[in-house]
C-alpha cells in the first residue's frame, strides 16, 4: 500500500513539474505570429499575380462554358444549367448581343423576367445572379463595395436576392460546394466568378443577417480555399476577396473579433473600405487576427 502511495505521489510531482515547465516556457507573442504571417503573405504575393486582369474567356480550356456550372449537391433536383442564362447573351446569341446599341440595352435584355423573379426559389435565384451577363462589371470600380452597388442598381436579380431572408443560407451553401479545380475546369471565367460570389456574400444585407454559426462556416470555407490557393504555385485564383470575406463575416458576427479590428485604424479601414494597406496594421494586431482564426 505504501509503495502504491509513493508511486501516486511521484506521478503528481512529475505532473506538477511538467505544468510548471509549460508555464515557464516562453509563449510566441502576437507580434511574432504577425511577423510570421506577414512574411508568408509576402512570399505568396511574389509567387502569384492577382487575376484582376484575367481574360473574359480562358482560351486554354476549350471544354469550359460561359454559363455557371452548378456544383453537385447544390440543388435537390436535376436541371438544365442554361435555364438560368438570359435568352440573349454574348455567347449563345452573339449577333443579337452585338446589335444592341449600348450598355443600357445590354442591361435590359439581361434582367430576370418579372413572372420568374417573384416565384423562383432562392437557391435558383442565386444561379440566375451567378449567370448575369454583366456580372464582371463589379470589378470596374475602385472598391468591391462600389462595384456591387453598381450591379445592384443595374440588375433586378441582385436586388431581389437581397430581400430574401434565406439568401445567406443559399449563398453559403453554394460557396461551400464551390470546388476550385472543378469550377475552373468547367467555367470559362471561374476565377472571376468566385470573386463575384464572394462579393455577394460581402453585401451588407447578407453580413447583417449572419448567425455566429454561419459566420464560422464561412470562415472555415474561406480558410480551406485560402490554404489551397497559397499552396498551389500555379493557382490562377487570388486570395484577396477570400481573405476579405473571412474578415468581414467575423466582424459582423463576433464581438471579440470586432474588438480586435476596432483597436487598429488600418484593420478597421480594411473592413469598412476593403482597402488593405499592410503597413497600417501592426504585427501585434495581425497576430491577434491570425490567432483568432486559428482558434475558431
Provide a role label for each language-model segment:
Residues 4-5, 29-30, 59:
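Residue-level detector of intrinsically disordered/flexible regions characterized by low predicted structural confidence
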Residues 1-12:
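N-terminal Sec-pathway targeting helices
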Residues 38-40, 47, 58, 66, ...:
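Non-catalytic all-alpha helical scaffold/repeat segments
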Amino acid at each position: 500500500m505504501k509503495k502504491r502511495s509513493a508511486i501516486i505521489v511521484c506521478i503528481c510531482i512529475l505532473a506538477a513539474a511538467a505544468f510548471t515547465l509549460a508555464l515557464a516556457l516562453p509563449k510566441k507573442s502576437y507580434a511574432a505570429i504577425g511577423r510570421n504571417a506577414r512574411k508568408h503573405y509576402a512570399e505568396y504575393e511574389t509567387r502569384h499575380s492577382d487575376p484582376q486582369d484575367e481574360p473574359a474567356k480562358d482560351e486554354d480550356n476549350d471544354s469550359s462554358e460561359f454559363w455557371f456550372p452548378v456544383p453537385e449537391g447544390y440543388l435537390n433536383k436535376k436541371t438544365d444549367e442554361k435555364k438560368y442564362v438570359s435568352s440573349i447573351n454574348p455567347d449563345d446569341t452573339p449577333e443579337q448581343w452585338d446589335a444592341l446599341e449600348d450598355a443600357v440595352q445590354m442591361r435590359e435584355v439581361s434582367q430576370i423576367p418579372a413572372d420568374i423573379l417573384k416565384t423562383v426559389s432562392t437557391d435558383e435565384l442565386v444561379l440566375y445572379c451567378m449567370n448575369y451577363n454583366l456580372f464582371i462589371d463589379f470589378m470596374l470600380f475602385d472598391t468591391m463595395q462600389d462595384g456591387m452597388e453598381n450591379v445592384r442598381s443595374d440588375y433586378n436579380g441582385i436586388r431581389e436576392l437581397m430581400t430574401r431572408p434565406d439568401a445567406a443560407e443559399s449563398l453559403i451553401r453554394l460557396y461551400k460546394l464551390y470546388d476550385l479545380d472543378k469550377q475552373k475546369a468547367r467555367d470559362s471565367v471561374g476565377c472571376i466568378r468566385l470573386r463575384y460570389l464572394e462579393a455577394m456574400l460581402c453585401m451588407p444585407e447578407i453580413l447583417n443577417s449572419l448567425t455566429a454559426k454561419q459566420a464560422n462556416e464561412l470562415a472555415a470555407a474561406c480558410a480551406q480555399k485560402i490554404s489551397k490557393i497559397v499552396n498551389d504555385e500555379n493557382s490562377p485564383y487570388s486570395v484577396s476577396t477570400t481573405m476579405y470575406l473571412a474578415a468581414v463575416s467575423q466582424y459582423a458576427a463576433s464581438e471579440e473579433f470586432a474588438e480586435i479590428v476596432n483597436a487598429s485604424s488600418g484593420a478597421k479601414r480594411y473592413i469598412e473600405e476593403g482597402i488593405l494597406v499592410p503597413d497600417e496594421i501592426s504585427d501585434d494586431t495581425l497576430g491577434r487576427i491570425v490567432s483568432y482564426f486559428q482558434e475558431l
